[in-house]
Amino acid sequence: MSTYAIIKTGGKQVKVEVGQAIYVEKLDVEAGAEVTFNEVVLVGGETTKVGTPVVEGATVVGTVEKQGKQKKVVSYKYKPKKGSHRKQGHRQPYTKVVINAINA
């Protein structure tokens, strides 16, 4: 059974395995840099370690592949019979990370 981990990043929890590419909320690092996630909630595989709230000494190491923005989301407000409307677009920034190692 392959080793996996659940990490906390950007206010979300993400299940990761070695070699997997994940998209997380924007991190302030350059593309090609190595990033370490210290908030590991669970490590699974042969045995499972559950943190209270995090697993002591466990880290997940990954490499930043690229920074980007998601597709545009358009919100539109409209007041009937008043001629009032407003259109606003938003593109959420993200970071693509490839997981290199899970250290339990």
From Swiss-Prot:
UniProt keyword list: Ribonucleoprotein, Ribosomal protein, RNA-binding, rRNA-binding
A molecular-function term among this protein's GO annotations: rRNA binding
SUPFAM superfamilies noted in UniProt: L21p-like
Cross-referenced InterPro entries: bL21-like, bL21-like_sf, Ribosomal_bL21, Ribosomal_bL21_CS
Taxonomy, superkingdom: Bacteria
Record Pfam families: Ribosomal_L21p
GO cellular component: cytoplasm; ribonucleoprotein complex; ribosome
Listed GO biological process terms: translation
Keyword rRNA-binding: yes
Entry's family note: Belongs to the bacterial ribosomal protein bL21 family.
Oligomeric form and interacting partners: Part of the 50S ribosomal subunit. Contacts protein L20.
Primary role: This protein binds to 23S rRNA in the presence of protein L20.
Name by which UniProt lists this protein: Large ribosomal subunit protein bL21
Organism placement in taxonomy: Bacteria, Bacillati, Bacillota, Bacilli, Lactobacillales
Gene that specifies this protein: rplU
